[in-house]
């Protein structure tokens, strides 16, 4: 008769937990340091030694989690993606003001740290990730809203909206539009969503009456 005996003492799990915590702390320090550098300089000034000095880490630690500065910039882009996702979490997607409220939340996020964010958007676009890297969260917000109105045309309408959205962000990043211009242009994109909803509502009402 065999016995199943647990010989583990929990040290392996503890080591994994410590490693995960160390990674989270170190990567956060690197990301914060990168933003500090980008506020005063450009992405061309990012290096493991510079980030390490600002973050209070060793170069080896920076290299461990970000072997290249490209990966660090991508981490900043991912941070924007999460921010875009969170921007719509508490909004009522059925509300008539949802598109504008979402846009305003996105603009507030971008303008909270505009100089690094401009560079992150441009570099992520030029380094193989495209605008999708910094705006992926937006598609997760817009497409479900469209699908609730018209599942058949939702993907096409969302593609149009996202194209306009990304184009506006890229123009802001490349041409340094004013804060007011960014908000105004993104609100125009929001108005496209509102107009599309109205068209679908009218079509639905018309088919119902028929």
What are these regions (language model features)?
Residues 1-13, 140-144, 148, 174-210:
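C-terminal peripheral helix-coil segments that are non-catalytic and often amphipathic
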Residues 1-41, 45-54, 71:
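Basic, helix-initiating cap at the start of DNA-binding domains
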Residues 38, 70-80, 124, 131-134, ...:
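Alpha-helical DNA-contacting segments of helix-turn-helix folds
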Residues 45-47, 69, 149-150, 196:
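Short glycine/proline-centered loop/turn elements that form peptide/ligand docking sites
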Residues 55-66:
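Short hydrophobic/aromatic patch on the recognition helix
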Residues 75, 86-114, 161:
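Hydrophobic alpha-helical connector segments
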Residues 88-91, 120-124, 172-176:
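Secondary-structure edge/capping motif, primarily at the C-terminal ends of alpha-helices
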Residues 122-163, 181-194:
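Amphipathic alpha-helical packing segments from all-alpha helical-bundle domains
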């Amino acid at each position: 008769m065999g016995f199943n005996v647990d010989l583990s003492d929990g040290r392996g799990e503890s080591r994994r937990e410590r490693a995960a915590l160390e990674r989270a702390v170190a990567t956060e320090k690197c990301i914060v340091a990168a933003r500090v550098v980008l506020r005063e300089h450009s992405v061309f000034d990012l290096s493991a030694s510079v980030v390490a000095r600002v973050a209070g880490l060793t170069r080896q630690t920076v290299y461990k989690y970000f072997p290249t500065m490209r990966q660090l910039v991508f981490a900043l882009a991912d941070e924007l993606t999460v921010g875009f996702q969170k921007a719509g979490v508490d909004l009522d997607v059925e509300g008539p003001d949802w598109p504008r409220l979402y846009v305003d939340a996105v603009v507030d996020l971008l303008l909270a740290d505009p100089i690094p964010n401009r560079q992150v958007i441009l570099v992520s676009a030029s380094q193989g990730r495209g605008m999708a890297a910094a705006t992926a969260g937006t598609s997760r917000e817009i497409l479900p809203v469209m699908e609730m109105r018209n599942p058949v045309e939702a993907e096409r309408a969302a593609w149009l909206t996202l194209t306009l959205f990304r184009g506006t962000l890229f123009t802001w990043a490349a041409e340094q539009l004013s804060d007011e211009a960014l908000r105004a242009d993104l609100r125009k994109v929001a108005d496209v969503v509102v107009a599309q909803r109205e068209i679908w509502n009218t079509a639905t009402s018309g088919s119902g009456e028929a």
